[in-house]
Amino acid sequence: MILSQFDQNIQPLSSAILPRHIAIIMDGNGRWARGRGKLRIVGHQAGFQAARRAVRFAVHCRFNALTLYAFSSENWTRSNTEISSLMQLFIYALNSEINNLNKNNIKLRIIGDVNRFTQELQDCIYRSEQLTSNNNGLNLNIAANYGGRWDIVQGVKKIIAQIQKGVLKPNQINENILCKYVCMNELSPVDLVIRTGGEHRISNFLLWQIAYAELFFTDVLWPDFNDIVFRRALHSFMKRDRRFGKSAFI
């Protein structure tokens, strides 16, 4: 369960200065497994448990949205065995968690090009999204077969289609229009990006949505990510002076 095992001793942070939308690049599953002499899939399974903890904490803090980078469009270069194991884990995660997500008023959405997935996984995604579609609590977005460049391109293609239909004119196209056609367009932009695993890069994640996001990098491998590390990221965010491109002296 996501909430039933929550540590009641953890006190809520000040909601006035917390981020509304957090995105996490969940990195380090493979290294976590290798360091323990385990198969990579064991690391991914442990990463699934870390994701459950992150969702639980996000609900507790009453964030508006949490977006998790589960599978990038570049991850298809991994071995067939690992990809197959990941897809089965994805199906298991959806089937085992969806009722609990629904009970906790969480709205689940999968962002990315799901057409490349097996029909079984696509059906599972559809059922999960439909079941939680009317919920108005945490917006939980799972980025799967997702890439930031793909997101922008698919948005541009939709705009071109609207122009061809006569709905839009070329001279109407601006940032506000494009914003309506990228993933998660109805949610607030990402405020905070957390990346685990010690790498300091974005890896083609939400390139449009994180334009003014604060970045937090930690050496903690994803399976070891917990509420303490999450709070550390939040405290770092709360100390930032977010200027959104403006001068510090204005």
Curated annotation (Swiss-Prot):
Gene3D superfamilies: Decaprenyl diphosphate synthase-like. Mg(2+) binds at D27, H200, E214. Its cofactor is Mg(2+). One of its GO terms (biological process) is regulation of cell shape. Its EC number is 2.5.1.31. It comes from the Bacteria. It holds the Pfam family Prenyltransf. Keywords: Cell shape, Cell wall biogenesis/degradation, Magnesium, Metal-binding, Peptidoglycan synthesis, Transferase. The keyword Acyltransferase does not apply. One of its GO terms (molecular function) is magnesium ion binding. The keyword Metal-binding applies. Catalyzes the sequential condensation of isopentenyl diphosphate (IPP) with (2E,6E)-farnesyl diphosphate (E,E-FPP) to yield (2Z,6Z,10Z,14Z,18Z,22Z,26Z,30Z,34E,38E)-undecaprenyl diphosphate (di-trans,octa-cis-UPP). UPP is the precursor of glycosyl carrier lipid in the biosynthesis of bacterial cell wall polysaccharide components such as peptidoglycan and lipopolysaccharide. HAMAP family: ISPT (MF_01139). Belongs to the UPP synthase family. This is Ditrans,polycis-undecaprenyl-diphosphate synthase ((2E,6E)-farnesyl-diphosphate specific). It comes from Blochmanniella floridana.
